[in-house]
């Protein structure tokens, strides 16, 4: 009886401790970010097992002893650092914060793009609009704003976007070109990276990029620099959500990469309907995206789930990281049949290949 009670008490205390971590999470985030950006983690790592005292860290980084103390003690509380004989040493957590590209990309994205705007998450949820985007200016969505955002914010946004998508492109190309498409429509082409990889991979394909004019201007520059202007063309569209704005047609393949998650379910349905009209009779629709319910590792699902508030507060106010089953239903309701599903591309992407059918049913309804 006593043993059982003690065990329960420990569980309650642990739960309360975890709750405090959430309560203080913004403080910890900013302090640990400064440990990284002020090179405190770097000099501690370089010291190796002996570690460094506060005074030595201050001398090597130019940060005051007061500042070093404040930041290192927060790092200690979060298992970023450990202390022995007044010397701080890096833990495994600290190592990943300093050296892991995934962690760096995520931290920069959250700080530069999302942090201030997330203060207005409640407004965004109430209105269905990206209220947090107002910290940068007056736009309806972040996609319209991208070419106008401060350079550091742009850099963190594109690095985040490309870090995830770029890793999957080489894995996806064989699936696309095994079917030998001669023409491909890249919807949401962004900076043109996938289009460039397509024409490099296959000498016969012609790619049409469709996106907002501001995005295509950047893509056009990148393509011209690579010398592929004769095989990649642009199709600017001012409002992807205008259901009357038709897509160009007759394509052997239509490609959407990290695209549908940028929209609400109703908007996705409209986009899929128009994508169907863009396909040649035997054409294929390819959807490359990340679904948190198809991830092999818990860390991937965690990152994806907690990216959804970005879409709410900053991107458009009504989209999120979807479960696969939700997208599957929208695909079939739009008149497509799923031909194949391949998981594990790049950093946890799933590639869905679809063809049109007149008798589609939602298997997951």
Language model: regions and residue ranges:
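Alpha-helical subdomain
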Residues: 2-76, 82, 178, 185-365
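Conserved Class I S-adenosyl-L-methionine-dependent methyltransferase catalytic core
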Residues: 6, 10, 16-46, 59-60, ...
């Amino acid at each position: 009886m006593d043993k059982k009670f003690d065990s329960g008490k420990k569980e309650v205390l642990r739960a309360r401790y975890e709750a405090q971590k959430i309560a203080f999470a913004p403080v910890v985030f900013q302090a640990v970010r400064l440990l990284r950006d002020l090179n405190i983690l770097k000099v501690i790592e370089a010291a190796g097992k002996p570690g460094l005292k506060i005074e030595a860290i201050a001398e090597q980084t130019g940060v005051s002893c007061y500042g070093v103390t404040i930041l290192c003690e927060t790092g200690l509380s979060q298992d970023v650092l450990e202390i022995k004989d007044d010397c701080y040493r890096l833990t495994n957590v600290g190592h990943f914060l300093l050296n892991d590209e995934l962690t760096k990309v995520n931290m920069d994205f959250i700080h530069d793009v999302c942090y201030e705007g997330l203060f207005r998450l409640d407004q965004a949820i109430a209105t269905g609009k990206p209220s947090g985007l107002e910290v940068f200016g007056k736009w309806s969505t972040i996609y319209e704003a991208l070419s106008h955002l401060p350079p550091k914010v742009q850099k963190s946004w594109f690095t985040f976007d490309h870090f995830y998508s770029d890793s999957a492109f080489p894995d996806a190309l064989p699936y696309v070109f095994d079917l030998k498409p001669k023409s491909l429509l890249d919807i949401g082409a962004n900076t043109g990276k996938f289009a460039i990889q397509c024409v490099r991979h296959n000498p016969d394909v012609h790619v049409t990029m469709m996106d907002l004019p501001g995005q295509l201007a950047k893509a056009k520059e990148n393509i011209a620099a690579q010398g592929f202007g004769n095989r990649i063309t642009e199709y600017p569209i001012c409002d992807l959500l205008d259901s009357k704005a038709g897509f160009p047609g007759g394509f052997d393949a239509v490609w959407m990469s990290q695209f549908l998650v940028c929209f609400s379910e109703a908007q996705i349905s409209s986009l899929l309907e128009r994508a169907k009209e863009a396909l040649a009779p035997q054409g294929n629709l390819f959807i490359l995206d990340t679904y948190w319910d198809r991830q092999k590792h818990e860390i991937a699902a965690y990152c994806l789930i907690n990216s959804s508030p970005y879409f709410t507060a900053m991107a458009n106010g009504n989209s999120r990281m979807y479960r696969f089953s939700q997208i599957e239903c929208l695909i079939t309701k739009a008149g497509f049949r799923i031909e194949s599903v391949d998981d594990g591309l790049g950093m946890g992407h799933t590639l869905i290949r679809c063809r049109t059918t007149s008798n589609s049913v939602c298997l997951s309804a």
